[in-house]
């Protein structure tokens, strides 16, 4: 396993993968809010943008005072300065993955960063 790490994630309220996967360029968390619950604080970041993928359920994010409805299959990017808080719907929980990376750090991606072996 010199070139990869693998973990299994339980259905906990929040699991951070930085240490579990020995990540060096990102933080990834798996989040589950039950119906009617919310993240108990508003937050922002100094340097990192966040990308969210809703894997199940529904809810909303309030970003800089604006409500964004969320459902399974939605993707959402929030810049570092965006003040955000997440809420599950009253009648259904929400599960999502959050990927946190330094804003404007991506120099190459997809084919530009790949080496193809024949």
Features from the language model and the residues they span:
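A short, N-terminal "cap"/entry segment at the start of jelly-roll beta-barrel domains
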Residues: 1-26, 34-35, 107-118
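Short histidine-centered beta-strand/loop micro-motifs
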Residues: 19-20, 40-45, 87-89, 108-109
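Short strand-coil-strand connectors
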Residues: 24, 62-66
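Conserved hydrophobic/aromatic positions in well-ordered beta-strands
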Residues: 29-31, 97
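Short, conserved beta-strand element in jelly-roll/cupin
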Residues: 32-33, 44-62
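Histidine-centered metal-chelating micro-motifs
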Residues: 38-39, 60, 76, 81-86
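Short acidic-glycine-tyrosine-enriched beta hairpin
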Residues: 65-81
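Ligand-binding loop in jelly-roll beta-barrel domains
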Residues: 80-106
């Amino acid at each position: 396993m010199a070139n990869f790490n693998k973990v299994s994630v339980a259905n906990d309220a929040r699991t951070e993968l930085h240490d579990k996967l020995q990540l060096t360029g990102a933080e990834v968390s798996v989040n589950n809010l039950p119906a009617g619950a919310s993240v108990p604080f508003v937050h922002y970041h100094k340097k990192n943008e966040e990308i969210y993928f809703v894997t199940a359920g529904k809810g909303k994010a309030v970003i800089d005072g604006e409500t964004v409805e969320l459902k399974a299959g939605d993707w959402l990017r929030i810049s570092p300065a965006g003040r955000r808080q997440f809420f599950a719907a009253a009648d259904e929980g929400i599960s999502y993955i959050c990927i946190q990376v330094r804003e404007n750090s991506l120099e190459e991606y997809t084919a530009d960063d790949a080496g193809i072996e024949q």
